[in-house]
């Protein structure tokens, strides 16, 4: 074999090895992967779906939470805020959603409160914050959803919490202007460490007059528990309707256990 031909063959081999090495380095360090923070390769989302083991939970089939109109109520020289929050997704909910309630006088923020809420699939519940101090009299409030992770609902059973024997009325005695009496029945097969109860008082037009929230601890399966809401000082308007909603966070495994 001629010397020149041999040099060409050797050079070709070196080039092939170099090109192969570069391609391998690119595939390992720069090519599409399930950890590069980009939607590429066979992925259906960013580092999820398709060739990646992680499922895409934030796909287009999931809808954002729907926020209703915000009610601001002055009570005892402070301010309460209430609105309905709806999750219209059928299989996914939130074990925890962080939010901020901001109260404004004109464009100036004069009060705020941060909190957390949970929502099951296809659920509407109240978001309530009470006793917010403000630097000036607010004329509006806004609620900002800050963070939260979708969780697939895999429980066999939703909470079955029933409100029984609800009654309400004006007492107009010292320390008790208005009260609501009720019973909470746990028809679920689970015992709950905590059951959350929301109360919203409205007039005949549907305007929110007063709100409150509370919780019951250690509510056993099959148990019926008495409870009372009361407002020690007067609020404006004539109460005609009281909405009571009870719920418990089944996304939190520490909150429930079966019989």
Pin down the residues of each PLM region:
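Surface-exposed interaction/gating patches
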Residues: 77-92, 148-211
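Short, recurring structural edge motifs at helix starts
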Residues: 33-39, 70-71, 86-89, 186
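Cysteine-rich modules of extracellular adhesion/ECM and protease-associated proteins
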Residues: 6-60
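Terminal connector regions
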Residues: 117-118, 131-172, 210-211, 228-259
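Proline/serine/threonine-rich low-complexity linkers at boundaries of modular beta-sandwich domains
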Residues: 29, 55-63, 152-160
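Exposed beta-strand and adjacent loop surfaces of beta-rich binding modules
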Residues: 96-100, 140, 194-198, 241
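A cross-kingdom feature marking solvent-exposed beta-strand/loop segments within repeated
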Residues: 66-71, 78-87, 93-98, 102-131, ...
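Proline-enriched interdomain boundary motifs that mark the N-terminal boundary
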Residues: 62-68, 162-166
